[in-house]
Amino acid sequence: MHAGAGLCDGDSVRLLVDQAPQCVDRLLQLGMEFDRNRDGSLATTLEAAHSHHRVLHVQDRTGHALVDVLRERAEQRPGLLHRRGVRVSQLWVEHGRCCGVQVVDGSRLQWIRSRAVVLATGGGGHLYTNTTNPAQAAGEGVALAWSAGAAIEDLEFVQFHPTALKLPDAPCFLISEAVRGEGARLVDASGQSPVADLHGADLAPRDQVSRALLRCMREQHTDHIGLDWSGIPREQAERRFPTILERCRQHNLNPLEQP
């Protein structure tokens, strides 16, 4: 609630806190294999504005692993028709009620009737020049709902993540906050911390860290900030963040040697 600067919906926060444990149990039942400690307990890490280690993970590909498990389970359900490569272009609305969708399937336009329509299209990161979102996240789900007459709220709440790998002619790649949670530090060209004055420093709320980094870059007339991994033992870094390290190495970067 504090990290939300007083803007959090209290009921939503309470719902998350109360129901998170049983949701995790359900994911485990579905086959989600979170990382574990040597004693078999669930391994947790620290992220921004958290006072305790509570974030479950699967190395540095938690989201990918979660989607794989849920997709596999969904496709096992009888009576489910799964359509890939089909784009929804319009919601079908009659008498103020959504009763289906119009889809583009190759060169064909098709209407599909449904008793219920759920839009789960992700965000709109690709409305911005720089984003780590997948290419499909262009805000189309929100636009579809708005065009059909749905009430839209809280569009101003766009999260700007502080750390990403930004190189010429390459998509932005997210550098997980968990890297800082495991001991990495943000540094400027002289090795000083641009977030030292923030409560929580490298793990202050994301909006505060993002603003501090932007302010530092403007003052120093630079377009990037470094991330010093020296606080993470090499073996631990290789085990926890193989995807991030592999992506960096594809571009001849080794964050374990040079911020």
Model-derived segments and spans:
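An anion/pyrophosphate-binding glycine-rich loop and adjacent beta-alpha core
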Residues: 144, 150-259
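Hydrophobic or amphipathic alpha-helical targeting/insertion segments
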Residues: 20-23, 32, 141, 147-148
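Extended, hydrophobic alpha-helical segments in both membrane/secreted and soluble proteins
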Residues: 117, 137-144
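Conserved redox-cofactor binding core of oxidoreductases
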Residues: 28-109, 113-116, 120, 164-167
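Flavin (primarily FAD) binding-site architecture
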Residues: 119-133
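Glycine-rich active-site loop/strand segments that organize a redox cofactor
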Residues: 1-16
